[in-house]
């Protein structure tokens, strides 16, 4: 059994990236970048375990893609790594950033082969440009540009990261502890993705698949007294409202389920559970806006939505255009890509008895095409 665990750091907010989509959720073929990098590593070496850090809200989504250990990331890279190290049981750990996807097998193998030589094995490259420090030109042959992955003694790394200082990588933390670091030559292809312009350097990545992803949503709410009726985010004049934990906007709820279904991200109850008082009586427009923000951050583009409201009463026709305008504002997609229909059940069933309203939705998504940047 291997004595080495792989830790991949992917909990960042991509604040410097300059796009709505997070770096770890750029799609390569039909895989998000974090999964592509994970599979690239696991194809190279039989790790004892793989631990991936993720933003807390995204952990349920990561778990739908793989069976690796997913842990909660933190505000800093260092704290995220400490969280991951709590799950590491092996004497050695290989740490890398998901934002450095073009990992070269020969570099990884060289790192692993040299693991007994120091507390940390570090790949580096030398700068090709002139280097100036404080207005003084220095010998660039004495300068090392540090890369990941880096292999460390697990116990020493844990100790190094708890010195009360913030470090930008494992090697600097271990050096500050007075432990030995061993450098090996890395590879210039192992670029780190920080800014959107860096995408042009990552020629190892396959462009996103042209796959269309389609999801369906269905929701039902019963009528109740003493509540206002909301559909598609607008108030509908009626003598009853709908019962529910939130404002019970049945149309928006069906649409959220369709969007999440297309992304493969579960359903509205997983994302906004009714056991959470945060969502008590909440305006469903806020839930839809958060869903749209999340889908964009995870690399999806909303291509089209189709929504059917099933109600005996009130009559929906007079409000359809206003509803479409509301959805246009919430989804932030062109007006003509939103289709809204209304029907009755001809007095059949609970809808026909005027006991409640149902809604059905279909959503089509595609992947954000970063190759066109």
From Swiss-Prot:
Residues holding a divalent metal cation: 219, 221, 253
InterPro entries, per the entry: IspD, IspD/F, IspD/TarI, MECDP_synthase, MECDP_synthase_CS, MECDP_synthase_sf, Nucleotide-diphossugar_trans
Coiled coil feature spans: none
Chain segments carrying region 2-C-methyl-D-erythritol 4-phosphate cytidylyltransferase: 1-213
Catalytically driven reaction(s): 2-C-methyl-D-erythritol 4-phosphate + CTP + H(+) = 4-CDP-2-C-methyl-D-erythritol + diphosphate; 4-CDP-2-C-methyl-D-erythritol 2-phosphate = 2-C-methyl-D-erythritol 2,4-cyclic diphosphate + CMP
Keywords: Isoprene biosynthesis, Lyase, Metal-binding, Multifunctional enzyme, Nucleotidyltransferase, Transferase
Chain sites annotated for binding 4-CDP-2-C-methyl-D-erythritol 2-phosphate: 219-221, 245-246, 267-269, 272-276, 343-346, 350, 353
Pathway: Isoprenoid biosynthesis; isopentenyl diphosphate biosynthesis via DXP pathway; isopentenyl diphosphate from 1-deoxy-D-xylulose 5-phosphate: step 2/6; Isoprenoid biosynthesis; isopentenyl diphosphate biosynthesis via DXP pathway; isopentenyl diphosphate from 1-deoxy-D-xylulose 5-phosphate: step 4/6
Annotated EC: 2.7.7.60, 4.6.1.12
Residues the UniProt record annotates as site (Transition state stabilizer): 16, 23, 245, 344
GO molecular function, one term: 2-C-methyl-D-erythritol 2,4-cyclodiphosphate synthase activity
GO biological process, one term: terpenoid biosynthetic process
Cofactor: a divalent metal cation
Top-level taxonomic group: Bacteria
Record site: Positions MEP for the nucleophilic attack: 140, 192
Region (2-C-methyl-D-erythritol 2,4-cyclodiphosphate synthase), start-end ranges: 213-373
Pfam families, A to Z: IspD, YgbB
Family recorded in the similarity comment: In the N-terminal section; belongs to the IspD/TarI cytidylyltransferase family. IspD subfamily. In the C-terminal section; belongs to the IspF family.
The protein's role, per its UniProt record: Bifunctional enzyme that catalyzes the formation of 4-diphosphocytidyl-2-C-methyl-D-erythritol from CTP and 2-C-methyl-D-erythritol 4-phosphate (MEP) (IspD), and catalyzes the conversion of 4-diphosphocytidyl-2-C-methyl-D-erythritol 2-phosphate (CDP-ME2P) to 2-C-methyl-D-erythritol 2,4-cyclodiphosphate (ME-CPP) with a corresponding release of cytidine 5-monophosphate (CMP) (IspF).
Protein name, as recorded: Bifunctional enzyme IspD/IspF
Gene name per UniProt: ispDF
């Amino acid at each position: 059994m291997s004595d080495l665990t792989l830790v991949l750091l992917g909990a960042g907010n991509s604040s410097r990236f300059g796009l709505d989509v997070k770096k770890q959720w750029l799609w390569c073929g039909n895989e998000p970048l974090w999964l592509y990098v994970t599979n690239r590593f696991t194809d190279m070496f039989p790790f004892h375990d793989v631990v991936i850090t993720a933003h807390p809200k995204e952990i349920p989504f990561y778990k739908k893609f793989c069976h690796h250990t997913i842990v909660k990331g933190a505000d800093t890279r260092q704290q995220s790594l400490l969280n991951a190290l709590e799950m590491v049981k092996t004497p050695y750990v290989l740490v890398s950033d998901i934002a450095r996807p073009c990992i070269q097998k020969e570099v990884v193998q060289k790192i692993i082969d040299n693991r007994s030589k120091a507390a940390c094995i570090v790949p580096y490259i030398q700068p090709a440009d002139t280097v100036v420090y404080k207005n003084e030109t220095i010998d660039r042959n004495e300068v090392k540009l540090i890369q990941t992955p880096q292999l460390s003694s697990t116990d020493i790394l844990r100790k190094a990261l708890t010195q009360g200082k913030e470090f930008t990588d494992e090697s600097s933390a271990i050096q500050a502890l007075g432990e030995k670091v061993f450098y090996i030559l890395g590879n210039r292809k192992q670029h780190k993705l920080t800014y959107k312009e860096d995408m042009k350097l990552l020629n190892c990545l396959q462009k996103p698949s042209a796959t269309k992803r389609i999801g369906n949503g269905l929701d039902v709410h019963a009528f109740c007294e003493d509540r206002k009726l909301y559909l598609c985010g607008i108030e509908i004049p009626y003598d009853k409202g709908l019962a529910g934990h939130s404002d019970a906007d049945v149309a928006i709820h069906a649409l959220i389920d369709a969007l999440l279904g297309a992304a493969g991200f579960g359903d509205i109850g997983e994302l906004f559970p009714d056991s959470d008082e945060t969502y008590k009586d909440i305006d469903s427009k806020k839930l839809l806006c958060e869903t749209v923000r999340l889908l964009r951050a995870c690399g999806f583009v909303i291509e089209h939505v189709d929504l059917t409201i099933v109600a005996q009463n009130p009559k929906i026709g007079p409000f359809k255009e206003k509803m479409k305008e509301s959805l246009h504002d919430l989804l932030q997609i062109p007006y003509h890509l939103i289709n809204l229909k209304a029907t009755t059940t001809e007095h059949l069933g609970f809808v026909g008895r005027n006991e409640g309203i149902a809604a059905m939705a279909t959503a089509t998504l595609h992947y954000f095409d970063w190759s066109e940047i």
